[in-house]
Amino acid sequence: MFEYKCKLVKVVDGDTVDVDIDLGFGVWLQNQRIRLYGIDTPESRTSDAEEKKYGLAAKERMQEWLDGGNLKIVTHKDAKGKYGRILGELYTFDTNINDKMVEECHAVGYHGQSKEEIAEEHLLNRKNVVI
């Protein structure tokens, strides 16, 4: 695993962000897409109005967490996921944002299962999310 300071460019959705990564010595990787490792949030770009509502709530919560700056990304395997995104855990100060999204029921644990396998968990989360 590798650890880098980074600056938020934009929140794409509840489990994906774009950041500029500080490699040190004044070297930066600009506008890198990060997929938050080990979590899945409802889709914010979908024709399912109910899922979209919860997906947008997850995106909004992610934005609230990251507005403070002082971000750090801990990458996993220094590799990219199936859609070409860097996989990592995002921290603000010492708070693991991946874990907080699950704790607050905006996300479920995800380790390669199919969408069908985690659909029930997403439905259960809807009962606990304040929108």
Predicted regions and their residues:
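Small beta-barrel nucleic-acid-binding modules, primarily SNase/OB-fold domains
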Residues: 1-131
